[in-house]
Amino acid sequence: MDATTINSLFLVGALLVAASILVSSLSSRLGIPILVIILAVGMVAGVDGGGIIFDNYATAYLVGNLALAVILLDGGLRTRVASFRVALWPALSLATVGVLITTVLTGMVAAWLFNLSVIQGLLIGAIVGSTDAAAVFSLLGGKGLNERVTASLEIESGSNDPMAVFLTVTLIGMLASGQTGLHWGLLGHLIQEFGIGSFIGLGGGWILLQLVNRINLAAGLYPILVIAGGLAIFALTNAIHGSGFLAVYLCGLVLGNRPIRSRHGILHMLDGMAWLAQIGMFLVLGLLVTPHDLLPIAIPALGLALWMILVARPLSVMVGLLPFKAFHGREKAFIAWVGLRGAVPIILAVFPLMAGLPNAQLYFNLAFFIVLVSLLLQGTSLPWVAKLLKVTVPPDPAPISRAALEVHVTSEWELFVYRLGAEKWCIGAALRELKMPEGTRIAALFRGQQLLHPSGSTTLEVGDLLCVIGHEHDLPALGKLFSQAPQRGLDLRFFGDFVLEGDARLGEVAALYGLKLDGIDPGMPLSQFIVQKNRGEPVVGDQIEWNGTIWTVAVMDGNKIQKVGVKFPEGTRPGPGLFL
């Protein structure tokens, strides 16, 4: 390869990445997932469009694995361990039992539609059996879903790859050797994948955390150290026959949930790296496919995709979540719909090609077609389905910017900046009248281009910039304090006519609103009553019905219900109102 060829590769690669970024602005206007647009750019530039011929499956496999490792590391860093209280076991059930059921149901229909053997059909089912972390993390961000749904989908997508990889590799081995039966040794191999991946991921994450916090480096080197360490953990786990995908996700989880030096710098750089990984991966996969090869299989492939989306995935979710009573029917329905397929199935479809199996090109084309249908149908409709099934909750108002305060090595202090508009509740209030969360301080107040010296008598005006020092866990309280009037109205429409304290006694609540206790202990706190009726760990947005009224969890403090909204049937709202 001469210098001219290398320079041409740089030019084409840079133009494709730039084009993907520029056309991504169409995503919000057209309501099409950004990953589909990037995939389309690759297809348009490929053999049937711009004429770029790319058929190197080994390179695609390399790029795909590298990109997924970075995306999973970033996803783990942003996942809060607190969400595990409501979603760990349900997500693991979906990642194992769910993938197995989807594989079998999809595989049997694939064998019938394409006149394949049962083992060949099951291989297709295994290839498309897992949800994709890149697609899930990308499309769920900022949708305002309740914690139980979001955590279940994110943990599932981060942990279901071992099952899909295990099934795919096992079935490829069976086809290559002519084997037709299963044996118990395969179960041991699956346990090995999960066990080694978990051990190396958690242990390696802890070691990497100690390195970051104990070694003095230039600030810009810490993100690079984290990425290099994450990739080393990914590769080492794969080398000893564990799940590298699970390991790198757990590594990120450890780093993201412990005090770590240069936290914001690491997250900021990884955000950009994760975007670059997604763009590069979907561009390569778009270049790899030959669009005219998809046309002959379009009708049966569409039938298989719809079967998986409308039948196999919903059945696997219903069975996988059967033991978990906290999930409402609408939450199960949404989780069933958001079985997003992305890069993982396409990368798994490269395995048969590299193994030289018969019909390997068919497996690849089918996987690509199913991913395309999934992203277009499920990804595009996700916001509408979320509203239809009522799994969204009003988001907490966020600061316009936030920055870390590195006062010591593992400092978790941050500076939050809020801009006060005319609709803010605090306009006209003196600073001493603000009920600031404990441990927070107002550091500065800007009015126009002037820095004021704030005192207790300083009143807030429209357009003021307020700088507050606090911790991440103070954001919900600060958000409520500096919320907008329309946002508060949205809260009241969602949570109900009144909001009560979670420790209010049922007897007092019943007496105030004329409700019947029917043998319920009048001394029981309202929060405890809702937990009992909910039959599981509560999250914001959970609802129960009692005495013809709707009771909604409005504010959580860790595992404890802090505030509860109550909504009365039309025309029966009591008075006077109560707002606590």
From Swiss-Prot:
Coiled coil: none annotated. GO terms for cellular component: plasma membrane. It is a multi-pass membrane protein. Its main location: membrane. It is found in: Cell inner membrane. GO terms for molecular function: flavin adenine dinucleotide binding; potassium:proton antiporter activity. The chain crosses the membrane at residues 6-26, 34-54, 57-77, 86-106, 108-128, 162-182, 189-209, 217-237, 240-260, 279-299, 302-322, 334-354, 366-386. Residues 402-484 form the RCK C-terminal domain. The keyword Cell inner membrane applies. InterPro entries: Cation/H_exchanger_TM, FAD-bd_PCMH-like_sf, FAD-bd_PCMH_sub2, Na+/solute_symporter_sf, NhaP2, RCK_C, RCK_C_sf, Transptr-assoc_dom. It comes from the Bacteria. Keywords: Antiport, Cell inner membrane, Cell membrane, Ion transport, Membrane, Potassium, Potassium transport, Transmembrane, Transmembrane helix, Transport. It holds the Pfam family CorC_HlyC. It catalyses: K(+)(in) + H(+)(out) = K(+)(out) + H(+)(in). One of its GO terms (biological process) is cell volume homeostasis. K(+)/H(+) antiporter that extrudes potassium in exchange for external protons and maintains the internal concentration of potassium under toxic levels. Belongs to the monovalent cation:proton antiporter 1 (CPA1) transporter (TC 2.A.36) family. NhaP2 subfamily. This is K(+)/H(+) antiporter NhaP2. It comes from Pseudomonas savastanoi pv. phaseolicola (strain 1448A / Race 6) (Pseudomonas syringae pv. phaseolicola (strain 1448A / Race 6)). The lineage of its organism: Bacteria, Pseudomonadati, Pseudomonadota, Gammaproteobacteria, Pseudomonadales. The gene is nhaP2.
